[in-house]
């Protein structure tokens, strides 16, 4: 697997995380077999449903752990990662462009060790 997207989840419901998962599924010009998502629950009693987790064309791994805070939960996601590259997203993020991952894959194929990208606020301001 080329890229795994790591997402900590605390009290976010299916409705909160669905736009991010949808925006990953909408990415164009990439092989969905090269993408995986790892979501780690940070000890919350709000769990994502199997219906949501099984409705995407890429692999989603979901892990439940004790409440330790967002940094420890990101590290827990990292412990499960096996891809060549990793990306961190928050549960309420989403990809603005359907070509965002294609652009990242293009740069990965050049051989960069790390990449940084801009983000856009909810108001769509960079």
Model-predicted segments: where are they?
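Short aromatic/hydrophobic "clamp" motif used to bind/position activated sugar donors
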Residues: 86
